[in-house]
Amino acid sequence: MMNKKWWHNKVAYQIYPKSFKDTNGDGIGDIPGIISKLDYLKDLGVDILWISPMYQSPMVDNGYDISDYYAIDPMFGSMDEMKQLIKEAKKRNMYILMDLVVNHCSSEHEWFQKAMADPEGEYGSYFYIKDGKDGQPPTNWRSYFGGSVWEKIPGYDNKFYLHSFAKEQPDLNWENETVREKIYEMICWWMDQGLSGFRIDAIMNIKKDLTWSDLKPDGPDGLADVYKITGKVEGIGDFLMEMKHRCFEP
């Protein structure tokens, strides 16, 4: 028989911070705005707040391109205000979940900037960097946003990096144990700040088909959707169990 968890029989409400409540008149919702509506949300019967990304980001994909996992984007407020939100929610017996993106980061993230400066160095291994086929992409995979999943690295004739989404969202190499450990450290840090958990975006994409084989084209562009090399790959469960043991168990 399954033990009852804290989230069972709870009502969750998603907040898209940009459009929720603006308190400083700049036209963008902010953390103080969320705090100001906690009593209202509690009266509605809400127990859990799932908040879409508020991390530092160039906002190419509405915050799903994170350039610093440890910082709040100034458009939403400060880290002190985030801690205050968590504190005020707990006073009302409410729980805060944050959206988290760990399949990829922003191309402005420090790791990726270092990888581009030295693709064959330590940080290059944080991403999927492959040689092309005589200057053409390594495979014929199509990104979720259209076009090839491969982007040529500036200054190199035949090196490409993988991005399942926008080119500004390079995929992190989950096969690299150091990358996984850094992700788990970040998750644990946020839990230490008082978060109750996360909604993890695009998690099915973290395990790739490492044969790097072309697929049968499924469109006139000669490409095949990238989900075909993630949807049926063995091993994602191992990554998720490792994350569970490292981050979410006592």
Question: What are these regions, as identified by a protein language model?
Answer:
Residues 2-188, 192, 204-250:
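Acidic/aromatic-lined carbohydrate-recognition and catalytic surfaces
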Residues 196:
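Receiver (REC) domain switch/active-site residues of two-component response regulators
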